[in-house]
C-alpha cells in the first residue's frame, strides 16, 4: 500500500479524523460553530483538505488526532511537546491540548516543517515550527484511535 505525500499544498487529513470531528462539532456547537475561532479553523481545515485519506495511507509527518507533536519556537528555539486530543481529554498540565482549543486547532492537519501561529493566554502570538511527530497513531498501525 502506498503512503500519500504530505506535501500537498491543499493538505491531507484522515477520513477518520474528518468524520469524528465534523460530528463532534455539529453535536456540540451547531450554529454557534462560526463564533468560535478555534472551531472555525478546524472546520476550515476539514473542508479545504485536498486529500481525505484512509488512516493507513496517512503520511507519518502529518499531525492527526492523538499525535504527539514537537514544536520549536521560531525565535527562541524553545521546544514544546503537546498531544493533540479530543475535548474530553483536554489537560494542559499533562500537555494534552484539545483540537478545539487555539493550540490544538493551530497544529491540526499541519506537517513537519510547517509553522503554526499560537496565541498564549494573554493573546500574544508566537510562531512555532512543527519539528517532529514522535508519535502518530496511524504510523504505528493504530488505525482507529
Task: List where the protein language model places each region.
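Long amphipathic N-terminal alpha/beta scaffold segment
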Residues: 40-90
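Non-DNA-binding regulatory cores of transcription-related proteins
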Residues: 66-68, 76-125
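Generic detector of short, locally flexible boundary/turn motifs and exposed helical patches
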Residues: 31-38, 47-49, 80-84, 93-98, ...
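Acidic/glycine-rich phosphate/pyrophosphate-binding loops and surrounding catalytic core
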Residues: 9, 127-129
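Residue-level marker of positions within ordered structural domains that often coincide
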Residues: 26, 74, 135
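Short peripheral tails and domain-boundary helices/loops at the edges of structured domains
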Residues: 131-145
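N-terminal intrinsically disordered, low-complexity, charge/repeat-rich segments that act as generic
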Residues: 1-60
Amino acid at each position: 500500500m502506498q503512503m500519500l505525500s504530505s506535501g500537498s499544498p491543499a493538505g491531507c487529513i484522515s477520513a477518520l479524523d474528518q468524520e469524528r470531528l465534523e460530528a463532534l462539532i455539529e453535536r456540540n456547537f451547531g450554529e454557534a460553530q462560526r463564533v468560535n475561532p478555534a472551531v472555525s479553523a478546524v472546520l476550515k481545515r476539514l473542508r479545504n483538505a485536498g486529500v481525505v485519506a484512509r488512516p493507513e495511507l496517512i503520511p507519518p509527518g502529518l499531525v492527526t488526532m492523538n499525535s504527539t507533536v514537537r514544536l520549536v519556537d521560531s525565535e527562541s528555539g524553545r521546544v514544546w511537546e503537546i498531544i493533540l486530543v479530543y475535548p474530553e481529554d483536554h489537560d494542559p498540565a499533562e500537555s494534552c491540548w484539545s483540537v478545539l482549543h487555539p493550540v490544538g486547532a493551530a497544529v491540526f492537519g499541519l506537517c513537519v516543517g510547517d509553522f503554526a501561529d499560537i496565541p498564549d493566554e494573554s493573546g500574544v502570538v508566537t510562531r512555532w515550527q512543527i519539528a517532529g511527530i514522535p508519535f502518530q497513531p496511524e504510523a504505528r498501525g493504530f488505525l482507529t484511535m
